[in-house]
Curated annotation (Swiss-Prot):
Disulfide bonds join 447-450. It comes from Arabidopsis thaliana (Mouse-ear cress). Glycans are attached at residues 160, 364, 416, 530. It is found in: Endoplasmic reticulum lumen. Residues 1-29 form the signal peptide. It comes from the Eukaryota. This is Protein disulfide isomerase-like 1-5. It catalyses: Catalyzes the rearrangement of -S-S- bonds in proteins. CDD domains: PDI_a_family, PDI_a_PDI_a'_C, PDI_b'_family, PDI_b_family. It is an enzyme of class 5 (isomerase). It holds the Pfam family Thioredoxin. Keywords: Disulfide bond, Endoplasmic reticulum, Glycoprotein, Isomerase, Redox-active center, Repeat, Signal.
Length: 537
């Protein structure tokens, strides 16, 4: 499991928010203990085998009496506990070793461990040769460091001693599929009808391939796609009856590929060419539900969607259910162009990082918004959400007719103002599209030095009063935004937008005195057109 978020880039608002969300899912640093107790356990292999043998005998003797706790206990004993030099011996002595690095104090580790144990049980049952192990990286920090475990929880697959970082989902099924793909078993073959129900009990999302023979170009491309995809289980069969059990919508006995998902849009037929790239493209566009519920553990998966224009509905669960059916119809209509995501608005850890971008405080009112991760833009449905208004909003997004949303204060009255107040909604008109040169002061309420600079700007505005081609303006960056107002967090900031060159504003040093700024304005704007300079304050 990848633990360290990629560096945050200013070019993508949605990327930034998803990485914020990852902070709720992942702990990226761990503490080192005062002592590092490490010991060998040379008899652990035989002890483990004996424990598993006892478990299997008990299950045979009283299968109906096994409690859930006993089942979990058995699963956890399948996972080898590593420590000290024993770790290196295990990794070097086995072709495939999956290691979970955890810490006892880490809540996410505690959540993942039973799923990891469940995956270990499933892999053992299907005859996988991978050895599943775990190590307390807090206690055995030296070994954890040597394994390059840099945070908790971390999942690493060692193939002949070389590690691969796990980058899949957090469910047991996700882990099993990923491990199978990486250890040489990307496809499950079903030969008889009797095998199908057992398969359906274990797998809820899968790709079905029906072939006359497991050879030829079409099958080869299917296999290549199975090896390239790390998320979805691929299944192959030569028996059309098996295929129809798995995919009841199957109408033909010819070569066939289809995707099965556990949701409203359960069966999706692939009708493209039999090329690996096209099959993977089909999966990328169709693997998500019509409406994906965002959780702390699936943010990376959501971000992997090739559909980067994403509609997000924030509401309470009951309110979402009331809209569920019409929303599914809308999502189906715009499936190839928009991705639809539901966020429980009562989960502040998930909802608030998004809502704060729109200046929306915590509440229970349904909000519909959208992010375009390619254009770094966001949109907001400002009317009351209803099936009709949501569909109209989505249609506008798909056709590019919805205006971008900028967080903005109300438009102020600037009549007779010596310094124009700019807000998000007026940035285009007053700054970018105006014919005048604009000296813009960017400030925030918490800025220590902003008040002193504001007084200098007011003095300059009075000094240059009467110069029609020069406008003094200011904007509160904490309450207003615009995609072309790209500034750092060091306020105050002075920007000069020269007429005809608005795309490349000049940034002035805030250490300049009022006289220095006056000289700069005169040299940049006034002297070329007017021989009379006005720099004496």
């Amino acid at each position: 499991m990848s633990l360290i978020p990629k560096p945050i880039s200013k070019v993508s608002t949605f990327t930034f928010i998803l990485l914020i969300l990852l902070s709720f899912t992942i702990i990226i640093a761990y503490s080192s203990p005062d002592s590092n107790v490490e010991s060998n356990e040379p008899g652990f292999d035989s002890d483990l085998d004996q424990l598993l043998a006892v478990d299997e005998q008990l299950q045979e003797d009283r299968p109906e009496q096994q409690s859930e706790a006993e089942t979990v206990s058995k699963a956890q004993r399948i996972v080898l506990e590593l420590n000290g030099d024993y770790t290196k011996r295990v990794i070097d002595g086995n072709e495939f070793v999956m290691v979970l690095g955890y810490a006892p104090w880490c809540a996410r580790s505690a959540e993942l461990m039973p799923r990891f144990a469940e995956a270990a049980t499933a892999l053992k049952e299907i005859g996988s040769s991978v050895l599943m192990a775990k190590i307390d990286g807090d206690r055995y920090s030296k070994i954890a460091s040597e394994l390059e475990i840099k945070g908790f929880p971390t999942l690493l697959l060692f193939v002949n001693g070389t590690s691969l970082t796990y980058n899949g989902g957090s469910s047991a099924e996700d882990i099993v599929i990923w491990v199978q793909k990486k250890t040489g078993a990307p496809i499950i073959t079903l030969n008889t009808v009797d095998e199908a129900p057992r398969f359906l009990d274990k797998y809820h999302t899968f790709v079905l391939g029906l072939f006359e023979k497991f050879e030829g170009s079409e099958h080869n491309e299917f296999v290549k796609a199975a090896k390239s995809d790390d998320e979805i289980q691929f299944i192959e069969t030569r028996d059309s009856d098996v295929a129809k059990l798995l995919f009841p919508d199957l109408k033909s006995n010819n070569v066939f590929i289809g995707l099965v998902k556990p949701e409203a849009e359960r069966y999706t037929v692939y009708d493209g060419s039999y090329k690996m790239e096209k099959i993977l493209e089909f999966l990328g566009s169709n693997k998500f539900p019509l409406f994906t519920k965002l959780t702390e553990t699936n943010t990376v998966w959501v971000y992997s969607s090739p559909v980067k224009l994403q509609v997000m509905l924030f509401s309470k669960a009951d309110d979402f259910q009331k809209l569920a059916q019409p929303l599914e119809d809308i999502a189906r209509k715009f499936k190839s162009k928009l991705m639809f995501i539901y966020v429980d608005i009562t989960n502040e850890n998930l909802a608030m990082p998004f809502l704060i971008l729109f200046g929306i405080e915590a509440g229970n009112k349904t909000v519909v918004a959208a992010f375009d991760n390619n254009l770094n833009s966001k949109y907001l449905l400002e009317s009351d959400p209803s099936p009709n208004s949501i569909e109209e909003f989505c249609s506008g997004l798909a056709h590019g007719t919805v205006s971008r949303y900028y967080r903005s204060e109300p438009v102020p009255d600037n009549e007779n103002a010596s310094i124009v107040t700019v807000v998000g909604k007026t940035f285009d008109g007053l700054v970018l599209n105006s014919r005048e040169n604009v000296l813009l002061e960017v400030h925030t309420p918490w800025c220590v030095n902003c008040e002193a600079l504001s007084k200098q700007i007011e003095k300059l505005a009075k000094h240059f009063k009467g110069f029609e081609n020069l406008v003094f303006a200011r904007i509160d960056a904490s309450a207003n935004e615009h995609t072309k107002l790209q500034v750092d967090d060091k306020y105050p900031i002075i920007l000069l937008y020269k007429s005809g060159e608005k795309e490349k504003p000049l940034k002035l040093s805030t250490k300049l005195s009022a006289k220095d700024i006056a000289v700069f304005i005169n040299e940049e704007l006034l002297k070329p057109k007017n021989g009379s300079a006005k720099d004496e304050l």
